[in-house]
C-alpha cells in the first residue's frame, strides 16, 4: 500500500474523530465484468459514456470508466457538512472493490483519492507498460491518494481490515 503525505494527514484526522453513531454493515453493490480484456463496472457496461478509442490503453479506459464518486452516495447537505464521511465511504468501497476483484486472476490497483470535499474510488488491472498514476504520489498536491494491490492471493491492507 502506498499513500502520499496529504492522505496520511486525512487518515490521521479520521482516526482522531469519535463518532457516536451506529455504522450500517451494508456495503455498496459493486459488480465487475471482464470484457475484451478490460475489467469494468457493470453499471458502465449498461450505460457506456466513454469509448475505448478515446484512450491510449486499457488502463486509461478502466480508470475513467471505473470511477465511483462517494458524494453521489449521500445527500449533498450531508456530504458538505461531514466531508470525512466521504473518505470513510471511500475506504469501505475500496474494500468492497478489492473483494470483488479477488475473484479474478491477476493483480489490480485500487485507488482512493480525497481532497477534503470529494472522494473517488477507481481500479484497474496492472499491466506491463501501462500506468495511470504517477510513480511519486507526492506530486498530487491537491488531493490525498492511497493505492493498494488487489486480486487473488493478495491480502487486504491492514487499514481496510474489518
Model segments located where?
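A short linear-motif detector with a strong N-terminal bias
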Residues: 18-19, 48-50, 89-92, 102-103
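Alpha-helical context
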Residues: 46, 50, 73-77, 86-88
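A short, surface-exposed helix-loop junction/capping segment
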Residues: 64-84
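Extended hydrophobic/Leu-rich segments
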Residues: 14, 77-79, 100
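A short, highly charged nucleic-acid-interacting micro-segment common to nuclease
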Residues: 80-94
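Alpha-helix capping and helix-coil boundary motifs
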Residues: 16, 79-82, 141, 146
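Acidic, proline/glycine-rich low-complexity IDRs
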Residues: 88, 95-162
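N-terminal leader/targeting segments
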Residues: 1-70
Amino acid at each position: 500500500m502506498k499513500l502520499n503525505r496529504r492522505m496520511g494527514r486525512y487518515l490521521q484526522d479520521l482516526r482522531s474523530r469519535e463518532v457516536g453513531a451506529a455504522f450500517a454493515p451494508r456495503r455498496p453493490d459493486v459488480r465487475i465484468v471482464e470484457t475484451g480484456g478490460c475489467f469494468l463496472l457493470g453499471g458502465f457496461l449498461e450505460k457506456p459514456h466513454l469509448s475505448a478509442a478515446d484512450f491510449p490503453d486499457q488502463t486509461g479506459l478502466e480508470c475513467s470508466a471505473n470511477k465511483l464518486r462517494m458524494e453521489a452516495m449521500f445527500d449533498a447537505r450531508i456530504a458538505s457538512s461531514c466531508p470525512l464521511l466521504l473518505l470513510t465511504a471511500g475506504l469501505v468501497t475500496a474494500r468492497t472493490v478489492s473483494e470483488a476483484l479477488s475473484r479474478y486472476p491477476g493483480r489490480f490497483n485500487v485507488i482512493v483519492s480525497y481532497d477534503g470535499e470529494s472522494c473517488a474510488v477507481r481500479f484497474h488491472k496492472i499491466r506491463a507498460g501501462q500506468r495511470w498514476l504517477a510513480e511519486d504520489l507526492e506530486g498530487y498536491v491537491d488531493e490525498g491518494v492511497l493505492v493498494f494491490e488487489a486480486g487473488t492471493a493478495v491480502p487486504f491492507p491492514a487499514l481496510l481490515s474489518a
